[in-house]
């Protein structure tokens, strides 16, 4: 068993509330943007410039974002994969990041 230290940010401090995000996602889809590709996972608004967009890994059943690229899927909780985020939400991530330790059961 090996412990992994990663930098994460709390989903609730980075994302908008569910209803606001869902409303923004619907508006973005009406404009032709795609969820998971060109819509921000945190706020649901369109990502205008995909070349400068960041991707964050959503882990622990959706409660944390991280930039860590290792074996997240072996930690406790569920791995929800990589999602694109816009520049404003990425700044919120960096502002709220903290280090946590996860247990890798391999």
Q: How would you name each of these model-derived features?
A:
Residues 9, 29, 104-105:
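Intrinsic disorder/low-complexity signal
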Residues 69, 73-106:
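Short, compact, well-ordered microdomains
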Residues 2-17, 21-25, 33-78:
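Short recognition patches in nucleic-acid-associated and regulatory proteins
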């Amino acid at each position: 068993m090996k412990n992994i230290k990663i930098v994460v940010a709390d989903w609730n401090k980075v994302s908008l509330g569910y209803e606001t995000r869902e409303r923004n996602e619907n508006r973005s889809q009406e404009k032709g943007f795609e969820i998971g590709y060109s819509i921000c996972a945190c706020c649901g608004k369109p990502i205008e410039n995909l070349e400068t967009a960041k991707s964050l890994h959503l882990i622990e059943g959706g409660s944390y974002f991280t930039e860590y690229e290792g074996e997240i899927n072996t930690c406790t909780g569920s791995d929800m994969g990589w999602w694109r985020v816009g520049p404003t939400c990425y700044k919120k991530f960096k502002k709220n990041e903290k280090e946590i330790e996860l247990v890798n059961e391999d």
